[in-house]
């Protein structure tokens, strides 16, 4: 059974997604909920489906995801990254097309920390001339 299941770990911001893909009918489950129930926003659902639509495997794979940390955007990005890695494990010849679409690269942007003496990460306190 393990040979028919493909795994990929995806990360984005503070979210981590563990993605298991196997041949099936196109069901996507996130934390034991259907994709449409888990993500309220259409954009998040679209982001998750992007790699599958690119390689035209939307109806051919069942995907089961466990995702932790972060918010909606981070989780959707992490799932997309994980699905991409699972697809590459399934068929290495998909790598160039996924790379060209920008799904293989891990988005390294994270929230910048707040600095001492500043209001936020870069926002300085208001300056009064007089």
Swiss-Prot record:
Q: Which UniProt keywords apply?
A: Ribonucleoprotein, Ribosomal protein
Q: Which domain of life is it from?
A: Bacteria
Identify the SUPFAM superfamilies for this entry. Answer: Ribosomal protein S5 domain 2-like
Q: Which GO terms describe its biological process?
A: translation
Task: Identify the GO cellular component terms for this protein.
Answer: cytosolic small ribosomal subunit
GO MF, any single term: structural constituent of ribosome
Q: Which PROSITE patterns match?
A: RIBOSOMAL_S9
Q: List the disulfide bonds.
A: none
Which Gene3D superfamilies would you find in this protein's record? 3.30.230.10
Q: Please name the NCBIfam families in this protein's record.
A: PRK00132.1
Q: What family does the Swiss-Prot or TrEMBL record give for this protein?
A: Belongs to the universal ribosomal protein uS9 family.
The name on file for this protein is: Small ribosomal subunit protein uS9
Q: Which gene encodes it?
A: rpsI
